[in-house]
């Protein structure tokens, strides 16, 4: 993975070392479940607006435990964490899903999460764990995906223009007025793209890169839905911009019925790796049952449903991908990453600087 650049040089992210003691370390992540009183009739799952599972999936948890799951949406990943922080003295629910690696450290540092991480993880899922002290003890990885530039192949073929490949290409004159991105201060994919540019160009270079993007006519939309479904020229939209920030897993859902070729694709040299987590909310009256729900979200019953319900990859190595994903949905071999603690320490300053450049 490509880490944050220092003095314009890309370094490589080593990741979390997997040692012979990993299995014990994973088991140690799970806190001892406190004794519970009377089991609840309902658990509240606080999540982002994009949460979706097929009909009947959450009912499997109910059939196993007798507990109904009430889903409460709370905005995107950033809004979700903000609301958890603002209500930590009177928690919104029992379990949270949708905190990603760009906001994990803030949630941990603000004390909104109880010490529980599922013991069901194996060495195969170790790459998705957060560092110790930055969420490993409180957050269980559930899904992941790469936020990348998506390209409308048909548009470029019709206009006889070679498709871009890298971030550097996006500021070239031939791609003027072709890119739309969600705002970094109001969209999780938008923030992920900003972080990709920070990782690529470093503290001294990303601001100039964004100034060049603005000069080259980048359009800033309010959120991912507007960027993808309104401004993008792909088949799901009526827009006129053939380049958009989306996910590497978006192209499979653009394949027309009966066809074998995806009309869009992801530029895998532009990607930022995003992982979403679930955790027990501190202050829940039902910590043991909340822990069961976290384990259920990691279970194959949920993991097999995630790709076609939320358009991202499951992290459970035992999960099965839908037919077609192997052909159209890709994961970048070398995505950009920034350590969660680094994001937490600099996020607000980066967003302030970004806003002064991108939305003057």
Question: What residues fall within each predicted segment?
Answer:
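Periplasmic solute-binding protein
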Residues: 101-112, 133-162, 190-200, 275-279
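Short beta-strand->loop
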Residues: 113-122, 139, 168, 248, ...
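C-terminal motif of bacterial Sec signal peptides marking the signal peptidase cleavage site
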Residues: 24-28
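A bilobed periplasmic-binding-protein/Venus flytrap-type ligand-binding module shared by bacterial periplasmic
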Residues: 150-155, 274-289, 297, 305-309
